[in-house]
């Protein structure tokens, strides 16, 4: 509404511009909205995400076409999901 995104609303055409992996499966994400948000990747469960438990694999992420990917794009996570499950980060 009037260029303001409220907490209950997801921005349209959301993309991730950068991802900075931290310890303990946390990462700082920069979204196309300009927001930086803290994402706890332990919410990524199931066999598809099991390799991310290896810290070396988790920290070797790349952003491809606005999506965070791992293992040469074999694993990815939708920007909308990461936005909904992250918290505002104030550096």
Q: Across the structure, where does each feature detected by a protein language model lie?
A:
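Motif-centric detector for short Cys/His coordination patterns
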Residues: 1-91
């Amino acid at each position: 509404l009037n260029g303001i995104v409220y907490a209950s609303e997801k921005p349209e055409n959301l993309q991730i511009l950068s991802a900075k992996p931290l310890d303990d499966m946390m990462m700082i994400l920069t979204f196309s909205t300009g927001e930086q948000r803290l994402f706890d990747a332990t919410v990524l469960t199931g066999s598809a995400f099991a390799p991310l438990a290896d810290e070396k694999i988790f920290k070797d992420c790349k952003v491809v076409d606005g999506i965070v990917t791992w293992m040469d794009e074999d694993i990815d996570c939708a920007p909308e999901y990461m936005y909904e499950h992250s918290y505002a980060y104030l550096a």
